[in-house]
Amino acid sequence: MTDQVQDENKLIAERRAKLDMIRKNCKANGHPNDFRRDSLAADLQATFGEKTKPELEEEGHIVAIAGRVMAKRGPFLAIQDVSGRIQAYADKTVQKELKEKYSGLDIGDIIGVKGQLHLSGKGDLYVTMDNYELLTKALRPLPEKFHGLTDQETRYRQRYVDLIVNEDSRNTMIMRSKVVSAIRNFMMKKDFMEVETPMMHVIPGGATARPFITHHNALDIDMYLRVAPELYLKRLVVGGFERVFEINRNFRNEGLSPRHNPEFTMMEFYMAYADYNDLMDLTEEMLSSIATDLHGSPKLPYGDAIVDFGGPYPRISMLNAIKQYNPDNAEIQALTYEQVADRELMANIARGLDIYVEKFWTCGQLLEEIFGETAEPQLMQPTFITEYPADISPLARRNDTNDFITDRFEFFIGGREVANGFSELNDAQDQDQRFKAQVNAKDAGDDEAMYYDADYITALEHGLPPTAGQGIGIDRLVMLFTNTHTIRDVILFPALRPQNKA
């Protein structure tokens, strides 16, 4: 046992002893629930922060505050609530009472204070502790440094502690909530209806990904946590809901990385009588307005760069993007779509770029891998990459002039994909053949290939109007809006390996 652990155990024991005494001497077994707060720290600062000391003395405002004790400096306690901090003042009489009643207050304790609002000599607001009550005794000490935990893993495992001591973490999560609300409000103003679709599927679908499997005991069947809501949302468009969206969780049984968490949040939406160009226009409008509303400007810092959400954003085909970022590769510069359809040629180009080639990869997958390795990391500014191959886009509409590609785009910022959208495939017979090709790919070893969904084919046979649909990764978008570089920092409780496993 380390000295640090021994010291912490000693502090916990001391606090438990204090709580035992408090239980005997105070009401509600030491956990009262009848104190009512009427003011938040930030509201008091906004309302009274510009007042002079004589003005506050004359006006005599009585306020009730409550929060966590974060610091003790002589007679002053720094009390933190959801909005910020404010000081409470304990004169010598109150200090004596606190010691007698509670054996003193500790950092982390939650208290309620009612008293008059004053201004200190340094210009800080404080509340006199005319009436006070210990609401919750903290049995564990907080980290000593107020800027947060130094160990990243502990920050994620004990997010509750991280949020207490780390203002940056609190602000990140507040911004996340604002981003989600702004997206929801934008969509509703565009006449989209918010819906909820199943989280458990009999057949996983809507994206090429490996699903999580669970078992329904009553039905005695395996079910899958959804990898995407796409097929259900398009069923709703078939049913006549022409503009729908959903903000919810998706689950993909894949690896962890700074940009991947197995449980993540997506906003997916579908609009009838539109195509993928309309989606790109809508995305530009949405992100520009949200950035301006939340940050006061469409230009946001991200790492060493400034990301400009103002638009319009470049629209570049995948093939041209590969050429743009491989200017010295003569073989790539000479590529045509006819050559991209030559698997052996594409595999050799990929190997020449030190890309490992899976035997089941199609021509489209090879093109996408080359793009991902050489072009994607360079896309720092908002950019639409278009003309995705049909064999990696099983739900997208084929292009009218080139059936090797689809009317699909992916949206990139900061060197990572943030959104994926396309004109929807509404040809039931073509969709049937694409599903069968996915089944063949799965049989060949591609764990992420889609399953065949017969009911979705039946829905298409009833008629899906010309439709465009898109998914936006909320977590990655929040990373951009908060200048954060790992997805774990924008998810309250990210997936972690259990501590008792190596």
Swiss-Prot record:
Keywords: Aminoacyl-tRNA synthetase, ATP-binding, Cytoplasm, Ligase, Magnesium, Metal-binding, Nucleotide-binding, Protein biosynthesis. GO terms for biological process: lysyl-tRNA aminoacylation. InterPro entries: Aa-tRNA-synt_II, aa-tRNA-synth_II, aa-tRNA-synth_II/BPL/LPL, Lys-tRNA-ligase_II, Lys-tRNA-ligase_II_N, Lys-tRNA-synth_II_C, NA-bd_OB-fold, NA-bd_OB_tRNA. Its cofactor is Mg(2+). PROSITE patterns: AA_TRNA_LIGASE_II. One of its GO terms (cellular component) is cytosol. Mg(2+) 1 binds at residues 410, 417. One of its GO terms (molecular function) is ATP binding. It is found in: Cytoplasm. Mg(2+) 2 binds at residue 417. Its EC number is 6.1.1.6. It catalyses: tRNA(Lys) + L-lysine + ATP = L-lysyl-tRNA(Lys) + AMP + diphosphate. Binds 3 Mg(2+) ions per subunit. The keyword ATP-binding applies. Its main location: cytoplasm. Belongs to the class-II aminoacyl-tRNA synthetase family. Homodimer. This is Lysine--tRNA ligase. It comes from Photobacterium profundum (strain SS9).
